[in-house]
């Protein structure tokens, strides 16, 4: 289905209502919230999923739809602004991890990442990574000791060459991967 197809928009609406029905909203409130999310979603199901998650987490007020970000990339921007208000902390602690993630051809193993990241910053250990992963929230998840973006679009947004304060250079990520490979005797061509 095309994103603008009325069946797609109806699917998004039904999803929002079903997901938020667990909360204490009246049918009228659910309808209004769903209509607002569908309108701002630009037909992107992932947008609706993320907004519902943010509403459930108390990060977005469902009664202020004009405050909802427009489009998926704006969702990511707003999310990062809330999670990383200090750009210094983001650049020092989070960006080095994200550089590796966006440059990798395959999901990265934690036991490979931590030694390299601790080489860059002596504070990096499993507890430090757990804190960073908590801040990243649902955008990146740990699956069996592997870090996985929840959707390709998050890496696309991070690496877009625009004015985002959270921009991650894929080129610098590749340089980090090469340094990592040299330090730990990995074959970069396999990463």
Regions found by a protein language model. Give the residues of each.
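Short acidic, hydrophobic short linear motifs in intrinsically disordered regions
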Residues: 106-116
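Short helix-capping/hinge SLiMs at alpha-helix to coil transitions
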Residues: 88, 101-106
């Amino acid at each position: 289905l095309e994103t603008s197809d009325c069946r797609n928009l109806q699917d998004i609406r039904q999803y929002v209502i079903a997901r938020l029905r667990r909360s204490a909203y009246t049918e009228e409130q659910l309808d209004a919230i769903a209509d607002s999310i569908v309108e701002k979603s630009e037909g992107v199901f992932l947008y609706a999923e993320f907004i519902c998650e943010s509403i459930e987490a108390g990060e977005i007020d469902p009664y202020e739809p004009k405050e909802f970000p427009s489009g998926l990339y704006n969702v990511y921007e707003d999310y990062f602004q809330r999670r990383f208000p200090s750009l210094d902390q983001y650049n020092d602690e989070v960006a080095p991890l994200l550089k590796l993630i966006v440059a990798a051809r395959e999901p990265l193993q934690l036991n490979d990442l931590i030694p390299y990241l601790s080489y860059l910053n002596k504070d990096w250990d499993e507890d430090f990574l757990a804190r960073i992963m908590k801040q990243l929230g649902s955008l990146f998840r740990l699956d069996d000791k592997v870090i996985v973006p929840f959707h390709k679009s998050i890496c696309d947004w991070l690496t877009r060459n625009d004015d985002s304060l959270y921009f991650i250079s894929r080129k610098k990520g590749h340089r980090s991967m090469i340094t990592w490979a040299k330090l730990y005797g990995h074959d970069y061509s396999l990463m």
